[in-house]
């Protein structure tokens, strides 16, 4: 199946990963330190822009103001309720997308006829912005938890399908020949060779899906909810209460960092064969 440039980028990233040596603790420390330097640098520039008047305080709160607001908001039961609703939608939708994406993508990549049949369907649907399905989902399921989870699921699904397909197609032929030499059935080779070899591809797709899922949950809560961080951001921004809105935005960013870091840890821990 011909791959788009985005598919190739994810596939190349995953394909090269199994041959990398285990990351040394010194290198991990190096990345951690410079990552922290980058974050602190951005915060300092943000604070400098706020202090010098480059950023209008009516529209952009300073980091110190956001921090002070966070100290007041985080213990609030109302705000914690918004946080819980968003976390619930995000993790439910992302988990379902991971399971469905792998179960759909691996067989399509493994069987050439399925690949040829579903390639144009996947290309067509993936080319449509997932936000375009929002009115349709509202009509089908109404406004509630189910519709929001579906939006998150749909937002995260296709990178996982595409990378699972690439993983199944990228199995080393030498491994398959060894399996056949031991008279392994197609199903046995799928379970013992294709599935483990596809894990780096799947994790690469999961990293992409995390960002898309966060966007999906925020957009869903903008239009389809009276709870959640997306609703909270929309409510506070419309009232020009920017500091609380930025607290919620920072929390969403921390969600993304934490989930991507978890995926990276899993790669470093289990995919160094």
PLM regions and their residue ranges:
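Transmembrane alpha-helices
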Residues: 150, 154, 186-220, 246-247, ...
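Short cytoplasmic-facing helical segments at TM-TM junctions of multi-pass membrane proteins
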Residues: 120, 160-163, 167-205, 229, ...
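Membrane-spanning helices that line or support transport/gating and their immediate boundary helices
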Residues: 51, 106, 113-120, 163, ...
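Hydrophobic alpha-helical transmembrane segments of polytopic membrane proteins
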Residues: 230-265
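Periplasmic/extracellular loop-to-transmembrane helix junction in inner-membrane transport proteins
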Residues: 16-28, 51-96
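Transmembrane alpha-helical segments of polytopic membrane transport and secretion proteins
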Residues: 1-40, 261-273
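Generic hydrophobic transmembrane alpha-helix motif, especially the helices
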Residues: 123-159, 166-167
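Transmembrane-helix boundary motif in ABC transporter permease subunits
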Residues: 92-122
């Amino acid at each position: 199946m011909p791959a788009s440039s985005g598919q190739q980028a994810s596939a190349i990233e995953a394909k090269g990963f199994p041959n990398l040596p285990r990351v040394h603790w010194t290198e991990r420390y190096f990345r951690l330190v410079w990552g922290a330097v980058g974050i602190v640098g951005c915060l300092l520039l943000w604070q400098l822009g706020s202090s010098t008047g480059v950023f209008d305080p009516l529209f952009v709160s300073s980091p110190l103001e956001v921090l002070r607001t966070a100290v007041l908001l985080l213990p609030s039961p109302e705000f914690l309720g918004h946080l819980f609703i968003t976390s619930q939608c995000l993790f439910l939708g992302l988990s379902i997308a991971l399971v469905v994406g792998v179960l759909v993508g691996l067989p399509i990549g493994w069987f050439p006829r399925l690949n040829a049949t579903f390639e144009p369907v996947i290309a067509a649907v993936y080319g449509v912005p997932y936000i375009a399905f929002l009115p349709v989902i509202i009509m089908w399921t109404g406004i509630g938890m189910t519709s929001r989870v579906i939006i998150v699921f749909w937002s995260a699904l296709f990178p996982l399908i595409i990378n699972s397909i690439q993983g199944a197609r990228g199995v080393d032929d030498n491994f398959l020949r060894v399996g056949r030499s031991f008279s392994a059935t197609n199903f046995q080779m799928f379970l013992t060779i294709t599935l483990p070899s596809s894990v780096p591809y799947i994790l690469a797709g999961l990293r992409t899906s995390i960002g898309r899922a966060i966007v999906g949950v925020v957009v869903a809560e903008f239009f389809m909810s009276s709870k959640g961080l997306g609703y909270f951001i929309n409510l506070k921004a419309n009232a020009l209460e920017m500091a609380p809105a930025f607290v919620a935005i920072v929390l969403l960013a921390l969600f993304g960092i934490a989930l991507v870091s978890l995926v990276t840890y899993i790669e470093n821990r289990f995919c160094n064969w």
